[in-house]
Amino acid sequence: VNAQDGKTAHNRRDRIATTGRTGPISTPEQGLDMAELDNALYERIGALSDAGDALMEDGDYAGALEKFWAGFDLLPEPKTNWEAGTWLMAAIGDANFYQEDYAAGRDNLGEAMHFPNAIGNPFLHLRLGQCQFELGNLDRAADELMRAYMGGGPELFEDEDGKYLRFLATRAEGIETP
């Protein structure tokens, strides 16, 4: 849910954008880097991302990954210059997390941190921290989950398994747990 307007985020880009300070999403109307992409290319990437989002909603994570990677492959080089790369890598890492492929999630979300507006984005830090936790990398998990908590507050964790927030409370004082 977008804390600013109370609306539910309907796709991965919205979720990432509503949980980030500056969010890795941009639209042609905002005049950010996606506006610099050729309109046809922007539409193709957006359509693939939307298709991936729909597959995620249906629980078809492998199918979603195919769509997200296809969109990512369309980005011009260097891919790390594009905010679209941020939200595509975030969506890929999110799908990895839901597939319980935590090593791939860690790797892809770690790679996402090299893209614009990724560092400091609470959603990215949340998913990266969750992957680190599941892999047993507890110090790294605590660091990433704290970044997520500091940027997104306890509400960022509302729809997540309570074990992540309970774990964070063992590592830091003042963590609000349900």
Predicted regions and their residues:
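Amphipathic alpha-helical segments of tetratricopeptide repeats
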Residues: F72-L75, G110-H114, Y149-M150
